[in-house]
Regions:
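Core segments of cupin and vicinal oxygen chelate
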Residues: 7-10, 17-63
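Basic/polar N-terminal segments that are highly enriched at the extreme N-terminus
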Residues: 1-7, 150
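Vicinal oxygen chelate
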Residues: 10-11, 20-24, 56, 68-69, ...
Length: 150
């Protein structure tokens, strides 16, 4: 199998983020029906989002009520900040605009749309010990950072 376009072989699909019409109904399906663990509930902070995962990963499925139901974005997880920075530079070198970058606490991500308007997130995870605060709660934040800081 060839490495088409030079993408790092350790890149994985990190998560899928879905826009849902009813958060309680969605959580009943993903948590109760499928058995995912609720790993973060932004509603506790007034944010219309929740995260579920299998095992101890921060999230495999993100749920929000930001826009009409459907795919919000797909995330590709890079092995480290250096590989993420290379991916951003490659996109920019090919004329694609990166919309913004965000520090989520345990994850740093950049966001853009593909040519058809589908949301794309490229991210890397910080070490697991940085994902939680002193009380063991997941750190949920969305601090904008300069794209060139990646």
């Amino acid at each position: 199998m060839s490495s088409h376009n030079g993408i790092h072989p350790a890149v994985r699909v990190g998560h899928v983020h879905l826009s849902v019409s009813d958060m309680d109904r969605a959580l009943a399906f993903y948590r109760d029906g499928l058995g995912f663990n609720l790993t973060g509930d932004g509603r506790q902070m007034g944010l219309p989002m929740a995260f579920v995962a299998a095992g101890d990963y921060h999230h495999h499925v993100g749920l929000n009520t930001f826009k009409p139901s459907g795919l919000y974005h797909v995330a590709f997880n890079y092995p480290d900040r250096r590989q993420l920075a290379r991916a951003v530079r490659r996109l920019q070198d090919h004329g694609y605009a990166v919309d913004h970058a965000t520090d989520h606490g345990g994850t740093v991500a950049v966001y853009l749309d593909d040519p058809d308007g589908n949301g794309i997130e490229l991210s890397y995870d910080r070490p697991r010990e940085t994902w939680f605060d002193a009380a063991g709660n997941p750190i949920l934040k969305a601090d904008r950072i300069p794209v060139d800081a990646i």
